[in-house]
Amino acid sequence: MKSIQIDKFGGPEVLVIKDVEIGKPGPKEVLIKNLSIGLNFIDIYHRTGLYPIPLPSGIGLEACGVIEEVGADVSLFEAGDRVTHASMPIGSYSEKQIMPEEKLVSVPDGISDEVASCITLKGITAEYLLHRAYPLKKGDKVLYHAAAGALGQILCP
């Protein structure tokens, strides 16, 4: 299968399309055919080495796809289910990837692959900021520094 990989840190020129082998899903894992991927600043941080990752490596944390195969003991999903994720392991810039079932979210029929693949990480971040980092209470005021960005559009309807 084709996968965008990096062998060294740097600019966009270090992104290389390679043919790579993908194994079978192990216990509690699924094989996903990626239909759409999300592009995020953290991908750039990984590519440049600002947030170092072991090399060589695939790149990308966010995708939407269809499960092609399930490993042993998978109980939440089955082949044919449409799912999204925004988490490790890195490697969503690829045709397929293996993911732990616990990292997946079902995608409702009314949401396109493109929307599902680009909103998941931002949605998780919004939930974390508003409910975990500092649980907002009635009357709290919030200053948004980047309301025009993807996260800002979720936080500032």
How should each PLM-predicted stretch be described?
Residues E21-G38, T48-G91:
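Glycine-rich beta-strand-centered segment in the early N-terminal region that forms part
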Residues H85-A146:
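NAD(P)H dinucleotide-binding glycine-rich loop of Rossmann-like/cofactor-binding domains
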Residues A148, C156:
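N-terminal Rossmann NAD(P)H-binding glycine-rich loop of SDR-like oxidoreductase domains
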Residues G10-I17, F41-D43:
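Short N-terminal binding/cap micro-motifs at the start of the first secondary-structure element
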Residues M1, D81, G139-K141:
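Nucleotide donor/acceptor-binding cores
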Residues I17-I22, C64-V66, K96-I98, L104:
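Conserved hydrophobic/aromatic beta-strand scaffold that supports enzyme active sites
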Residues L151:
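Hydrophobic/small residue at the entry helix of a nucleotide-binding pocket
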